[in-house]
Design a protein with these regions (language model features):
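N-terminal pre-first-transmembrane soluble regions of secretory-pathway and organelle membrane proteins
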Residues: 44, 48-49, 59-63, 86, ...
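Cytochrome P450
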Residues: 134-138, 344-365, 374, 426-428, ...
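Soluble catalytic domains of membrane acyltransferases
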Residues: 87-263
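Membrane-anchoring hydrophobic helices of lipid-metabolizing enzymes
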Residues: 2-114, 127, 398
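Catalytic lobes of large eukaryotic enzymes
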Residues: 190, 210-338, 359-362, 367-405, ...
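A structural signal for well-ordered alpha-helical scaffolds and beta->alpha junctions
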Residues: 77-82, 152, 230-234, 271
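Alpha-helical bilayer-embedded segments of polytopic membrane proteins, i.e.
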Residues: 2-52, 322-380
């Protein structure tokens, strides 16, 4: 009798598993349909424009109560950026494991910080936002971005009202505006994280080859998994946020099993598993002098490179792991906008097709086709091979590339510092060097090229 009951239970378990797999398979198939992608992008764009309009309405408030206007704009910005996070966390089901010192964990989300991330993946900006969301600072997160992005609807306009630091990548033009923008953040009422991609552009083998040629010419240790960091943006940010920001978070992102995540994969509901290593470094331990700060950043990237090497061998970062829980607010915000915007869209489509007008139907189809092209174009902008060019002339990669050989041996620190200072002074005379094409890389700003 017991054997019969056991067999029945096993059969029931198998049926449940088969039913679950079938449901997951159907849901996974649904996620891959272009209609779903179109709806997701429709909701994002329309809700984004609505939020941009609401942000515009806060302009009078800035002259009355600046701090209140800032807080309102943080909440409005969250309505946009959290949709992207919900896409990663809830739609694709991507998981994120955090490697960090448990003693540092209580500080996350409770202090202002500069976050230094590697720039190897198409969705690393999205993982950075997810990191911010897990600790409640997504709405107030900052980046150093190209000036052109300020004119882009939805994200660019959102960033404008968030007081994002924009730059043209020409230091002689940027110096005044960048410094003023950073100084304005000194009295920001919300805890914020300032995200920096010090490499300035996404890693590719072609860019890496050019970068290491410069490293060889300048006597810098070569990096295997990173481009040479552009030190100017980092040093200026540290200098002008000192006293407000209390720490730098050295962050390194990787994906398990050599996965190469893409935004299109996320839209298709493909699940990835991200590993994020975060090391908290008190800002007081970073040199105030610009040349010494540049040396410090180069050493940091040597350490990041060694960390990446360990990950490639072992498949994990050193230290204990933590899994910050997903917060429900990103999903609830996303569902709110979906419900709000899909209902009028469905009514409109029903009325259009009910009219029976061939012209109306053809116009609707053409608009959908144009929208699909727009969606594909936006996705294409995140591809690694669409990143900025890296330049071919000597001196274009890094304004501080004249730094003499930096080693990890303490016995050579003094000589290295002296050589670095001399090299940086020489490089300050080369402001006019221009990169081939549209991207100016002669004077590093460490901008985020998402």
């Amino acid at each position: 009798m017991e054997r019969i009951i056991k067999v029945i239970q096993e059969e029931a378990d198998k049926e449940v598993q088969c039913s679950t797999l079938l449901t997951m398979g159907l849901f996974g198939l649904l996620k891959m349909q272009f209609v779903c992608h179109l709806i997701i992008c429709y909701v994002f764009l329309v809700s984004g424009l609505i939020v941009n309009f609401l942000q515009l309405c806060t302009l009078p408030l800035w002259s009355i109560n600046k701090q209140l206007a800032r807080k309102v704009n943080c909440r409005l910005a969250y309505c946009i950026s959290s949709q992207m996070v919900a896409l990663l966390e809830w739609w694709s089901g991507t998981e994120c494991t955090l490697y960090t010192d448990p003693a540092s964990y209580p500080f996350y989300g409770k202090e202002d910080a500069i976050v230094v991330l590697n720039h190897n993946f198409e969705i690393d900006f999205l993982c950075g936002w997810t990191f911010c969301e897990r600790f409640g600072v997504l709405g107030s997160s900052k980046v150093l971005a190209k000036k052109e992005l300020a004119y882009v609807p939805v994200i660019g306009w959102m960033w404008y009202f968030l007081e994002i630091v924009f730059c043209k990548r020409k230091w002689e033009e940027d110096q005044k505006t960048v410094v003023q923008s950073l100084q304005r953040l000194k009295d920001y009422p919300e805890n914020f994280w300032f995200l920096l991609y010090c490499e300035g552009t996404r890693f590719t083998q072609k860019k890496h080859k050019i970068s290491m040629e410069v490293a060889e010419r300048k006597g810098l240790p070569k990096l295997k998994y990173h481009l040479l960091p552009r030190t100017k943006g980092f040093c200026v940010t540290v200098q002008h946020l000192r006293g407000k920001v209390t720490a730098v978070y050295d962050s390194t992102l990787n994906f398990r099993n050599n996965q190469t995540p893409t935004l299109l994969g996320i839209l298709n509901g493909k699940k990835y598993h991200a590993d994020l290593y975060v090391r908290r470094i008190p800002l007081d331990s970073i040199p105030e002098n610009e040349s010494e700060c540049a040396i410090w950043l180069h050493k940091l990237y040597q350490e990041k490179d060694e960390l990446q090497e360990k990950y490639s061998v072992t498949g994990r970062f050193p230290g204990p792991t933590l899994s910050p829980p997903r917060r429900p607010w990103a999903l609830l915000n996303w569902l709110f906008w979906i419900c709000l915007l899909l209902f009028p869209l469905c009514l409109l489509l029903l009325q259009l097709f009910h009219s029976g007008s061939a012209f109306t139907i053809c116009t609707t189809v053409l608009l959908c086709f144009a929208a699909s092209l727009g969606v594909r174009w936006m996705i294409g902008q995140t591809e690694i091979n669409r990143g900025s060019s890296y330049g071919n002339k000597e001196g274009q990669l890094n304004n501080n590339a004249q730094v003499s050989k930096v080693t990890n041996k303490d016995s050579r620190t003094t000589k290295t510092s002296a050589a670095c200072t001399a090299g940086i002074k020489n490089n300050h005379e080369q402001f006019s060097t221009k990169q081939e094409g549209n991207t100016q890389l002669d004077q590093d700003t460490g901008s985020c090229s998402c």
